Amino acid sequence: MDQKNNNLFQKAIEEVFAVSFSKYAKYIIQDRALPDLRDGLKPVQRRILYGMFQMGLKPTTPYKKSARAVGEIMGKYHPHGDSSIYDAIIRMSQSWKNNWTTVSIHGNNGSVDGDNAAAMRYTETRLSLYGFELLKDIDKKLVSFINNFDDSEKEPTVLPTLLPNLFINGASGIAAGYATNIAPHNTNELLDSLCLRIDQPNCELKQILKIVKGPDFPTGGNVYFEKSLSDIYQAGKGKFIIQAKYEVNKNLNQIEITQIPYETLKANIVKQIEEIIFDNKLSAIESVIDSSDRNGIRIIIKHKDFLPAEKIMAFLFKHTQLQVNFNLNNTVIANRFPIQIGLLSYLDHFLKFCHELIINKAKYELELASKRLEIILGLIKAISIIDKIIKLIRSAVDKSDAREKLIDNFKFTFNQAEAIVSLRLYQLTNTDIFELNQEQNELEKTVISSEQLIASEKARNKLLKKQFEGYKKQFHQQRRSQICGFINQKKVEESELIENKTYGVLITKAGNYHKFESNQLLKSTTDFKSESDTIIFAQTIANTDQIFIVTSLGNIINIPVYKLAFNSKNKLASLVSKKPILLEYETIVFVGTMNSVNQPILVLTSKLGMVKRIDLTKLNIKPLKATLCISLRDKDHLVSAFLQQDDKLICLVSDHNYYTVFHTNEIPLISSKGMGVKGMKLKLEDQIKFVVAFEANEPLVMICSDGSVINLKQTELVVVSRMATAKKLPVKKAINYCFSDATNTQLINFQGKNGSKLITTSELNQMSKTAISQTRFNKLN
């Protein structure tokens, strides 16, 4: 219960909140966010147009500073901040947002790229011809006026327009519990549909839709729909799909985009295509160039000829704003309440409003004409007895006495007598009776036509059709958007987007890569220079193939070759990039190709001597997603991985030159989450440095830190069981590299300060110790 004390009210917060919010919600629904069905304007837009009209900013008058208009509108009609008013003015002036702009701006009013308009102190504004037409005859009492926010001015509740502006320019807005999104339509089609509705008040929607083809957006584009047009326009709700319009130049392998979807930013579309090129999501696209100018939009996409332009565009429609959805929702204010309105209902409501305007105008003109006709008839009568009138006026004591005598003696009405005595005698005697008779005839015609318009719906319909035909000529509009019917989205398989070509791919331990022409494999490998990184994979491979990498953190990652960006220059890209495949501290241990599925067993070895085998076919490996293939303890990481064909010997070599050799089949097959088993007993502070898989007849080649090369035959090595006591190698120096080679022809990468060189084992044996000691080596797969 309310308690009143010293003009204070105590109420429960939930009661205050409910009442206050409901009032606020009603206000923003009725007076802020939703357009009026009749003139298609929100309150701020209506106040802007009326404020400019009151300032005399007509299409034929000079521009005035936007800041001045904003101040006038804010001070008299819309006290909600200058930025909201100026933003609305700018939007009302943008030809890519409206079929017909209601405001004209002199200066920078933004761009289709989303650039901001110049500040209001720099731009100038006035009403456009279309905007002025919305206000036509507003001073003839066609619409009602209400007090402004401080009761110091009057403002119209609606503009007296005979143009169906709601559907011509569309509208969008969000209120409490309501939202609206009305599509722009073609002016000529709407006016023709109104004429049809006048001629055939009971016509069906399908007849209207033969005229109104669908939305017509200022930026054009191809328009599709999922439900039928009749369902969408019957309910006033539905979804349109807008696609960019493009042309194909097959000779130049170019796609030229000439129209973009409504409410999208050209710069964002270009950026999205550039990101697709940068991320190598579609290798068929070579470049995108924005060549747009004042003559229109022109985005040029250069592409390779292996993929048709239609499939490229199908991909871009899916992954960029070259295709967007427009969710139609015709929510408007009608009779102070929000309703969702279909096309037929809108035409009927609007025609009813037009009839009200015509009747109000006819009443206004009838009143003026009747009053003037009364005066003219009195003047004509006075001229016919001018001598008596003059004599009577001269005998009168004053003006009121003369007026009374005219009424009493000659039966003039009060208004007629007032008009006569208000004239000077020379005006009365010199008045041309012919001109008065002519004006009488015109006024009588006006009275008759006004009375006819008030009384006859048929007469009003005739006038409306004439007005609509005039608007069709004055605001003639060619259709910009093409209505293409039901959407039939072309499905493009990923395999179709991949260029069937062989490339060279080079991958380093640190996660850098280079994709190049296949004939440049040797050059790219030998040109590689790095003091801290090492090549571990250099191979020609089909673009349609896939590689997988095993990392030091125990992850296995599948990478489609086409996802690797091509670079004609000898420049490395990184897998630790904007969208990282590897973590910054993660390195690559092994690289294989997915065509090795016939060798699905992967053998893994960690720094702390843990070994395991894993079946690749049982892993759910997804492209570009890390899949765990071994669990690692703290401070442990993978040092080796290789694919097992048959049972081989595996040699684990430690930092302290201990080794153990056993058969790979002794290593158990373990699930991806398993840590594996001990492969070698390590002494304190020792760790695995090299892992070599080899056949029984293959020698081990060891490169020592002093540059010496040692070949150990299998007979010199002790083959034991896994976890047997490690043996000491007959080598005193630290081992820099270790590999197997039975033929002395194994290619290894000789990497020095001045670049890289591919050499065989036999060539290695002929090098000096000094040269060998200053280089790094690695076997290439």
From Swiss-Prot:
Where, subcellularly, is it found? Cell membrane
Record's keyword annotation contains Transferase: no
Q: Which GO terms describe its biological process?
A: DNA topological change
Q: Which residues form the Topo IIA-type catalytic domain?
A: 34-497
Record-linked CDD domains: TOP4c
Q: Name one GO molecular function term.
A: DNA negative supercoiling activity
Residues of the active site are 122 (o-(5'-phospho-dna)-tyrosine intermediate)
**Sites annotated Transition state stabilizer:** 121
**Site feature location: Interaction with DNA:** 42, 78, 80, 91, 97
Q: Which UniProt keywords apply?
A: Cell membrane, DNA-binding, Isomerase, Membrane, Topoisomerase
E.C. number: 5.6.2.2
Q: Does the keyword Secreted apply?
A: no
Record's catalysed reaction(s):
ATP-dependent breakage, passage and rejoining of double-stranded DNA
Would you tell me the Gene Ontology cellular component terms? Answer: chromosome; cytoplasm; DNA topoisomerase type II (double strand cut, ATP-hydrolyzing) complex; plasma membrane
Q: In this record, what's one Pfam family?
A: DNA_gyraseA_C
How does the UniProt record describe the way this protein sits in the membrane?
A: Peripheral membrane protein
In terms of NCBIfam families, this protein maps to:
parC_Gpos, PRK05561.1
Annotated family: Belongs to the type II topoisomerase GyrA/ParC subunit family. ParC type 2 subfamily.
Subunit annotation: Heterotetramer composed of ParC and ParE.
Q: What's this chain's function?
A: Topoisomerase IV is essential for chromosome segregation. It relaxes supercoiled DNA. Performs the decatenation events required during the replication of a circular DNA molecule.
What is the name listed in the Swiss-Prot or TrEMBL entry for this protein? Answer: DNA topoisomerase 4 subunit A
Organism of this sequence: Mycoplasma genitalium (strain ATCC 33530 / DSM 19775 / NCTC 10195 / G37)
Top-level taxonomy: Bacteria, Bacillati, Mycoplasmatota, Mycoplasmoidales, Mycoplasmoidaceae
